[in-house]
Amino acid sequence: MNPADLPDTLDVAPLTGETGEPCSFGILIKPCRAGRHIGELSVTWLRALVYSHQLVVLRGFDHFASSDSLTRYCATFGEIMMWPYGAVLELVEHANPDDHIFANSYVPLHWDGMYLDTVPEFQLFQCVHAAGDMQGGRTTFSSTNAALRIATPAVRELWARAHGRYQRSVELYSNTVEAPIIGIHPLREFPVIRFCEPPDENDATFLNPSSYSFGGINKDEEEMLLVSLMKTLRDPRVYYAHQWQTGDFVLSDNLSLLHGREQYTHHSGRHLRRVHIHGRPQIANHHLVRSE
C-alpha cells in the first residue's frame, strides 16, 4: 500500500484518551467509503503500524462472518499460536464460569502467554457484538515503554531491582513464572515492563486469581512497588481504554503492552474473538520456572 494513497481511501488518526487528548500510542483507521473489507489492507503495512504504534484499531470495515474466516485471515498475518480449543478464543460470558476470563468481572493488567512455553507477539481481536456504551467492558491497554519514560528515577530504580513471581492453575496449564519488572523486548531489545497486576485484595468474588509475590526488594518496599506500578501504568499519558463497537478489529503488541478489561454488565452480550500470532522466530518463554 502506497502511503501517498491513504488520504483518499482511509482516515487515520491517533486514539483519544480519557482526557480528550491524543494518546501517546495507538491509531484508529476508518475507511473513507463503505464496503471496504479488512482483508483488502496490506498485512505487511498493518504489521509495520503495530511495530510503530503498538495498537491499531480498524473501525467501519467489512469483516469476518465466522471464526473460520477469521482464522484464515489471521494465518496471513503470521503463524497462529494454536490452543487445545483451536485458533480462536470466544470471549463471552459463561453461565457458570470457573475463571474470571469468562465472567463479567474486571481483568487486571497482564501479558498473554506468560504461563506458556511460547509467548505470542501479537493479539488480534474481533468484536462480534459490543456491550452498550454504558455497560462497561472496555479493554484496557498500557504502553510499558512509555510508562518507563515517565517514571521518576527513584521509581525506576525500585522497579529495576524487583521481580514478580506468579502462579496460576487453569484447565489448560498450571505453571509458575518469575519475571523482572523491567525486562527487554525479546525481539527488538528496548526495555519493557512485565507485570501481572494483582486483583483487588478486598474482592472475594474474583474467580481463580493467580498467586503473587515480589522479590529483589525489601519487604517494606513492596507497597511502594505496587502503588507506583499501578499508578504509572494507568497514567493517562500511557493508558487507553477501548470502548468496543460491533465490527471493530484490533491488533496489539503483546510484548510491549499490558492489557486488561473493565467489568461489564451481566448478560450484556459482549462477544470478542481473539487470536494469538507467534513472533518471527517464535518467542520462548524464559520466565517459566522449570521443575527439576
Swiss-Prot record:
EC number: 1.14.20.9
Domain of life: Bacteria
Cofactor: Fe(2+)
Binding site for Fe cation: 110, 112, 259
Enzyme's top EC category: oxidoreductase
Catalytic reaction equation(s): (2S)-3-(4-hydroxyphenyl)-2-isocyanopropanoate + 2-oxoglutarate + O2 = (2E)-3-(4-hydroxyphenyl)-2-isocyanoprop-2-enoate + succinate + CO2 + H2O
Family that this chain belongs to: Belongs to the TfdA dioxygenase family.
Purpose of the protein: Catalyzes the 2-oxoglutarate-dependent oxidation of tyrosine isonitrile.
Protein name (Swiss-Prot/TrEMBL): Tyrosine isonitrile desaturase
Organism: Erwinia amylovora (strain CFBP1430)
